Every structure is written in structure tokens, then in C-alpha cells.
């Protein structure tokens, strides 16, 4: 195995240059893999599994050397030709069944997808694995079942795991996004622990200040300038042609708004929301109900990280997604920047499908921080 001698401040150590092979489950458009690739060119995605054809196509377009399976993970498991010599398995099983967003459903079949993830571990036997999910996952029955499987007599007894809720803003993402991160390791290997925060609300103790919306969007044209591009490029996916593949920059297109919407946007100050609207611009339901989320039709602040970027960020009525200074929602490009996607990433699909890929992704800086932590033991 090749090694590289690294000389630091007063010390020298040996660091392996061996390729670290990644298997990405429930891969989406590849946000978590992108974070690993950003952390080190030692990481290489060798296989990925994704149900959604558009997201799988985006993954393939970005990581051209990866074997991407499009379909249910159960079908992939039935093929019995899993990749060999996998070092790290990563992935985020769909979380809607135990998400804090909306009603939780203990019977939701998506809650059992962690079992398919765990079954993959028994087949490929990686040294390490990472599961990313909503904050509620660590308090769920599903996580407890996962933990029980690692105890003596369990089908994952050769592994140990622990979890923490991490905030992407603490690792350099210009976005407040809290996620449960589970990191597991084979018991014969060193436990990696969790990445230390690199950023804080204010610079102190060696930590950098949070990255802001203004920093992330610096230099982005105020007026979206890619409206025509979306209809010009097509990629064949199965028996269909889908829009793409697009770089993030090519996703800076506009959305048509009604005159009343533009009036409302213009009346909302930076950091404000529908609560700041005069009565004549409020919808009847807003006048009747003064409680509820104040993020609805909210405007981002340029001097702070953004709120969590979700899948409908292009709809101001769905949250705090108005541009800090422009009278419009953030564009797909701006949302991708707030998620940390590099311009080398590629997206395929309808506008809605690409928004879903962006909003469902693990922020790249968070994935990179996890990857760098794993590098310390790999």
C-alpha cells in the first residue's frame, strides 16, 4: 500500500494514499458523496442506489465512474452482485415516517428502510458507515431497533454506532440545518467520533463566524439570466428525455408571479414575513389566523445563515425563501449555493424534480466534515 510522508509543525506521520471506496444508498443527487469527494480525492464512489430516476441520472452525470442502480433498494439487494471491498457505506433512508415535519406514522413503510440499509452492511462488511436523517430519528423506535441490532446476538453485533444531532452551519454551510448523523464502525476498528465544529454564530475560541446568505450569494446576478437554458438541454433517461444535465449556474432561472404577489414581496423587509404586510395585502386566512409559522413568505437576511433549504424553496408561501433584497424567491442556483454544491455538480429533471434533489441533499460542507473525520481513522 502506498503511503505519503506528511511533515507538519514539529512532527511527521505516515498517511495512506489508498483509495477509499464508498457505497451510497438512498443516494439522491449525490450530495453526501459530493461532500466526501470535496474532503479528499482519496474517496471514490463505486456504487449508488436511488429510487428516483431523475435523481439517479443526476448522480450518474456527476459521478460518471459510479455504478448507479435506479430502483427500489429491495430490487438491488435481490441482484446479489454488490460491490466488493467497500470501505464506507453512506446514505439517508427516507425519513418522512418519523420526521418532525407533519404527522408521524409508525406504520409508514419508509420507516423500515433502515433495515435494508442494515442488510447491506451484513453483505458488504464495510469498516465504517454513516446514516444521515432528521433530528427526530435519534429518538425513534427505528433508531432503537438499529442500536439493538448491534448488541450481542444482534445481526449487526460486529458493529458499534452512536449518533449526534449536527448543525450544518457549525461546519461552514451558509444554512442552519440540523440533522441526526449516525456513525458506525466495525468493532475491530477505531471509533472515529464526530467532527468538531469549525464555525459559530460569532468568531470566538478559534471558531470562524457562521457563513451568511450574503457571502454565499455574492456575485450572483440579481436578475435570473438562465430562463432559456432550461428548455435547450435534454438527456435521455430510460425511455424519456429529461431537462439537463445542468450545472448549478445554469439553474438561475426565474418564476412568474402574480401582481399581488409582487406587491406583497415588496412590502416585506429583510428578515420580515407575512406578519409585516398591511391588512390590504394579507390573504383573508392570514387576517383571521394571526398564529402559525412566521416564516411563511419570509425574507432571508443577508447577514445570517439561511433557514433550512427544503424541497419547495422556490415557493415563498412555503417558508422563509424570499431573496434578501430582490422581490422574488431564491432561484434553484441560489438554493444550490446555500447547500454548498460545487459548479461541477450536475442536475437532471424537471424544475420540481431538481428542487427536490437540492432540498433533500446533505449540505456539502457537513458531508465534507464527516468525511474528514473518517479520514483520521482510514
Predicted features and spans:
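Extreme N-terminal basic, low-complexity initiation segments
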Residues: 1-7
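Short alpha-helical patches at coil-to-helix transitions and adjacent helical residues
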Residues: 29, 143, 179, 210, ...
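Class I S-adenosyl-L-methionine
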Residues: 79-86, 98-288
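Core alpha/beta nucleotide-donor-binding catalytic domains of modification enzymes
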Residues: 16-125, 135-148
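C-terminal target-recognition/interaction regions appended to catalytic cores
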Residues: 237-378
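A short, structural micro-pattern
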Residues: 43, 174-176, 211, 303, ...
